[in-house]
């Protein structure tokens, strides 16, 4: 393999994919590759893909067509498609897209240098085997900036929700050693990072391979290892979130008071068909426990409109749930069949597309009203905001987030991204709060 070949990664999808791209970059750098700033400067272009939502292949199809043209001009250019899409739709990759030289699933990144080497010999190659032990222990991600960092604490999912493709693209659950996670958190704190997010398809299922320690124990250990760093986590499953975890959040001041708890539907019958393993009464009890233990906590969720067999009364139950819980934010989608899932194999996709879209819009409209009202209640208060970046829409202002994950835009003054700032909130929309600086709590040491 020629020394110093340049690679460029384009990442699609979730936070886990962002973390995986950092792992991919580290593997290639350690093998002697160099990073390219743009696709045009690269010898190897890697697309790290997500298969969770509808039309995952179509999202990369246009880019692959562009790369097909680029390969005619640059004969040695190699293109690899990585992540969940090739793991889920392997047959389609090579047959439909001649630009692709190699594909690799989420458990194969350690072997990318040899895969690229094979593809350089004009052999289209694939590495898609699941590795039930692979958690990329010992590989430190390449990270952009020094404000926020992701640490994947576990990979895969055992829940087998009927609509979800994750168990088929990322395999069964396996966890990072607790000592490795806390050690990485400590390193990030010493390097000056302000925020760490612990990632997993279902973090509540975390189990230390050596001791069996739970996620609440891991979260507590990370909070102690990085006491001056904000600690977040995602994603939780309602049936698995524990009182012990909630108590840990309440006990440690640097664990953010924000819980993302996907409910998917407000109907018990739909939840049963989804194979979620809980009902609405159990979900509402978890919400009550969270709010009792964490005054002022912000809550977000996921909603799917138009799942198989959903009736109008099921849809109304979802709207009622939104009114009851009054989430601060929600990720909302209409159902689309994902090949290979339990729903695709056993349930008819029998809700009309027009009904799916109408129901989704009604959910969005209601949630925007609720989010707007929740944000209005924050106006007049003072919040601690971690400045993250320049505001794209408001020159001279910074965008940051509160402990509760509310987005805040405020006048920059002498502040910079990474500063922790006290901001008086003066106005709001359904998505964003605006305010004026009242003081600097802690400056970012660049």
From Swiss-Prot:
Domain spans labelled Radical SAM core: 143-373
Cofactor: binding details: Binds 2 [4Fe-4S] clusters. One cluster is coordinated with 3 cysteines and an exchangeable S-adenosyl-L-methionine.
Residue stretches making up the MTTase N-terminal domain: 5-121
Residues annotated to bind [4Fe-4S] cluster 2: 157, 161, 164
Annotated EC: 2.8.4.3
Source superkingdom: Bacteria
Family: Belongs to the methylthiotransferase family. MiaB subfamily.
Lineage: Bacteria, Pseudomonadati, Chlorobiota, Chlorobiia, Chlorobiales
GO CC entries: cytosol
Cofactor dependence: [4Fe-4S] cluster
Leading EC class: transferase
Protein name from the UniProt record: tRNA-2-methylthio-N(6)-dimethylallyladenosine synthase
Assembly, per entry: Monomer.
Molecular function terms from GO: 4 iron, 4 sulfur cluster binding; metal ion binding; N6-isopentenyladenosine methylthiotransferase activity
Residues holding [4Fe-4S] cluster 1: 14, 50, 84
Record organism: Chlorobium luteolum (strain DSM 273 / BCRC 81028 / 2530)
